[in-house]
């Protein structure tokens, strides 16, 4: 890979990290109300129809962008949201992120 491409990819990764950090900090302070209007659920009728069957819904997402915000958005719109996550290497960050998840309505 050319040096310019490496630099471009590294810059994009840090740009995404910064955006994710800001979104998580806002969520930690303001809670679900901060994202209800900011993050609407497209295709909500499909989600409601699937949940009407009474068996629950499994939403699978790739490991891209702010996946924490995706779960928080579901919870902010009144749906129960559970996440499957791995433990972080930093226990201080893990405790903080666990509190952010709980404050957003995720379990």
Task: Locate the predicted segments by residue.
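Membrane-proximal helical "anchor" segments flanking the first transmembrane region
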Residues: 1-58, 65-66
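Catalytic core of membrane glycerolipid acyltransferases/transacylases, capturing the structured
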Residues: 12, 53-107
């Amino acid at each position: 890979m050319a040096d310019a491409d490496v630099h471009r990819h590294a810059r994009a990764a840090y740009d995404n990290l910064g955006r994710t950090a800001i979104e998580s900090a806002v969520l930690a302070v303001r809670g679900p109300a901060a994202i209800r209007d900011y993050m609407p659920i497209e295709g909500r009728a499909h989600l409601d129809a699937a949940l009407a069957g009474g068996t629950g819904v499994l939403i699978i997402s790739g490991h891209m962008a702010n996946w924490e915000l995706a779960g928080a958005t579901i919870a902010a719109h009144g749906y129960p949201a559970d996440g499957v996550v791995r433990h972080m290497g930093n226990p201080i960050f893990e405790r903080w992120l666990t509190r952010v998840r709980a404050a957003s309505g995720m379990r």
